[in-house]
Amino acid sequence: MSTNNALRVFWKSREWNMKTSTFDSDEDILLLPKRKRFRKKKSRPVRHTKRHEEEQVYEQGTTLPCSICKHEIDLTGIFLHKKQHVALATLGFQWMGRKKPQPSVIAVQRQFMISKLLSSFMFTEKTLQSINNAFELLWKKQIPAYYKIFDNIDRSVIYSQKICHLLIKGVGICEDRNSTWKADMNDKFTVVSNFGNKPNVCFFGLFDGHHGASAAELTSMELPVLLLHQLSKFDPSYQMTTDEQQIINSFYTVFREEYAAIEDLFSAINKTEAVRCEYEDTHKAFAKAFWRMDRLLGLGRKEVSRVQWSGCSAVTCILEGKPKSPYAHKNWKRKNTHDGLAESSPSQEMPKIISGILHVANTGNVQAVLCRNGKGFCLTKEHTTRNTNERRRILQNGAVISSNEPYGLVEGQVKTTRGLGFHGNLKLKKSIIPAPQTISVPIDDLCQFLIVATNGLWEVLDKEEVTALAMTTFHMYKETYCPIIPNKSPSKGPLLFSTSEPNLTKSQSNIHVLFQYKSVSEVRVSTTNSKENLSDSNYSKYCIYNPENVETFPAETTHRKPCSEKVTDRPTSVNDVATNEKESDTKSFYEGAAEYVSHELVNAALLAGSRDNITVMVIFLNGSEYQLLT
C-alpha cells in the first residue's frame, strides 16, 4: 500500500444529533432533543472531563479505504461491507461502486443461480445455502447497534512497557475480552527487556489461546526461557541465571537422551547443506524451543478437561539492536515474493545502514506486520484452513476439514492448522503441528513501527487497513494530545514521502529477508510420537531441533502491569540536564503514542465487528521519528 493510500484514512464528524450524556438508558437519550435547557450548560464537573473527551472521540467516525473496492468505508460498517462483497460475488454480481442492486434484480439473479445450479452436476445443499444466505444479506437492510459497541469499548485495558533499546521509541499493549462474544480472556503476552542479559536485545511474545487460557499462559512464561536456552548453546553472549538453569534441569526427565539424540541427528543433517546462512542457528533455536514447549504442554498441567485440552497460536520476536555500521562488504540480491517481501541473496547491494535484526517465528493465526516507509509487510504466515498449502497438508495427513463457513474447521474443532498444545484430542493433535514459520529481516531507519496482534484484529481488518489506521491515529495523537513536540534534528528528512519520488529506489520501498525457513506443505507427521515426528525428513527441514531446557523469566520480564489509559503529559524532573529532559520527553511521547494507537486499533476492531479476544501490541521504532516532521 502506498503512502498516499495510508493517509486516506481520515476522521469526520457524524451528524448523529447526539450530545455528550451520562444517561443510563436509551429512553433518556431519545428525549434529549426536546430538553433545550441542556444547551445552556457551560461547564462540567472535573470528574467527567476524561469521560467527556472519550465520548467526543467516539462521536467522530473513522473511515478507511476498503482493501477490495478502495471506497471510503466507515469502521462501523466495514464488517458488513466486506460480507456484501462476498455475497455479491456468490450471486455473480460485479461490484458497481456504492450502488447495490435493486431487490427485484437480486431476486431474479437468485432464481437464475439456483436454476443453473440444479441443471448442473455441482448441486450441493451447502452451495444452495450459500446462495440463500447471500440473498438474505443483500435483501435486508442492516442497522448497526452502536450502543452495544460503545459499552464494550470502555472495557479495554492498556499496559505500559518500559523498554531500554536503541531501536525502540515506545511500546504499548491494549487488550479487550470482547465481552459481547467471549466470556473469558485467553490472550497472553510477554515482553522481556535485555533478553539473555544482553543490552539492546528484546523479546516480544503474543499468544492466542484456544479452548481455554492454560496453554497460552504456560507458553507465555516458559517459551522465552526455552528459546534463551537454545540460543545460549551456540551464542555464549546469551546468559542464563542460576534459577533459570534449575528450571531447565527440572525438565530433564521430559527430554531424555534419545529425544536429544534425534534432534542432534537432524541438526547435523541440516548443517551439511551447501548454502548456510548466518542466522540459521537462530531459526533452529526457535524451532527447537517450539517443539519443546509443545512437548511440555503434553504433560497436561493446569488442564481441567478430560476431553479437550487447550492450545494456542503463538508469535515470538527477537529484536537485536546493533550500532549503525555500513554493510558495504556484503551484497544482496533482491527477489520479490508473493507477500511483497524481498528475499536477499548475494548479488545486488542492499541498504548500507542496518541498525538491527528482527527475528520472527509464528504458528497459528497471530500475525505481525512491519511498517516500513509507510508500507505494511506481513512477517508471519497464516496457519489456518484458509491457507491452501495448509489445507493440502491436513487432508494428505488423513484429517477431516468440516464444511463450516467460511473455510471449515480441522476435525470440526478449530480453524488453526499449527499451534502449541491441543493434546487432549489425539486425532486433532495429529494434524496440528508445532512447526513455526521463521524469518529474519533487517531493521533500519526507514522502519516505523511493528504491530503484533491476535486474530481478533485480523479477522476484520487486513494489513493495509491496519497500517493506514495506525499511521493516521499516530498523527492524531501528535496533533491532539501533544501539540508541543521536542525539536528534532533538521538533518533528518521526512519518512512519509511519496514512493514515486526519484530519491527512493524500488529496493528501498521493500524489506529484505535475510533468512527464512520455507514451509513445506507435504508434511505428514503425527505429533503424538516424538520419535516418529523427528525422524520424518520433510519435517526436520524446518522444525526439529535439540530442546532440553526450560527457564523462568528474568527480572526484566514484564507481565501485565496496567497503566492509565491515557499517557499524554509526563513532565521530567527540573534537576535534569536539558538533553536528558529532551530524551525523557521524547520517550514519554512515544510511549503514550504506542498506548494510544494500540487502544484505537482495538476500538477499531470492536467497531468493525470482531468476535474474538483482541490484543494489540504496538512497537514504535526509530523510523517513526522521521514521521513527526511530515
Curated annotation (Swiss-Prot):
Residues 170-621 form the PPM-type phosphatase domain. It comes from Homo sapiens. Residues 557-569 have a biased composition (Basic and acidic residues). The gene is PP2D1. GO terms for cellular component: cytoplasm; nucleus. Belongs to the PP2C family. Residues 557-578 are annotated as: Disordered. CDD domains: PP2Cc. Disulfide bonds: none annotated. GO terms for biological process: negative regulation of MAPK cascade; signal transduction. This is Protein phosphatase 2C-like domain-containing protein 1. InterPro entries: PP2C (IPR015655), PPM-type-like_dom_sf (IPR036457), PPM-type_phosphatase-like_dom (IPR001932). Pfam families: PP2C. It comes from the Eukaryota. One of its GO terms (molecular function) is protein serine/threonine phosphatase activity.
